[in-house]
Amino acid sequence: MELQLFGINHKTSNVSDRERFIINESNQFLLNTLIKDKYKNIIFSFFGLSTCNRSEIYILGKKGVIKSFFEEASKLFYLNEINISQFYFLQDEDAFIHMCKVAAGIDSQVLGEQEIFGQYKNAITLSKSIGVMDSNLQRYANKAIEVVRKVRTNTNIGVNPLSISGLSLKLIKNIFENPIDQKILVIGAGSLAQDVIKNLYNKGVRDIRAVNRSVKEIIISDSFGIVSSPLSTLHS
């Protein structure tokens, strides 16, 4: 058995392509069915991780199976529309090192950001709860958690606790003396955009407008009182 992975992230692809490949609970059920149908006794366990900036699938299986699994997963999720050069494939020690870097925030857009660690642990919890991660893969995942804790204890990597959304708020504060008096436009409807809006709202900013390609895709709590509109109205 060998730890292997394939993924796509902010370094290899643009936002629109990353949005095509989301690993949620239902998609993991589909992957599990695929494995049972075509990779029985070849792939033994897996888990998926999706954040604003990456989607990755980690597997424990026979050596060299990751490319074949990617091809089948591509058919399942229509990933053929994305150029294969935007994906990366890692195996064995390289896969584990990458897992540790991701969980520690070393591979993040904001070096050392802490949000990814929680997302990583949530992904593990979900995969365990739906029965797609076995004890062998869990050992790798738990070992990565140990590594992250040592890294954050023994280095300065965790000194900056900010996420992308936190940095956005910090930048606004640096530019405007009174951020709560400003009119803020947020472009996008993903989890990152929603985190930015929540942070702004919690800091007292009330005049917020959110635009996206489709207004139907903007899902924000009504309690925020956000004005939502499609991207076509940006200049209106």
Where are these regions (language model features)?
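Short acidic low-complexity segments
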Residues: D222-S236
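Short glycine-/acidic-enriched loop or helix-start segments at secondary-structure transitions
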Residues: F69, V196, I220
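A glycine-rich (often HGG/GG-containing) alpha/beta subdomain
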Residues: M1-S108
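Hydrophobic alpha-helical packing residues
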Residues: I35, L200-Y201, S221
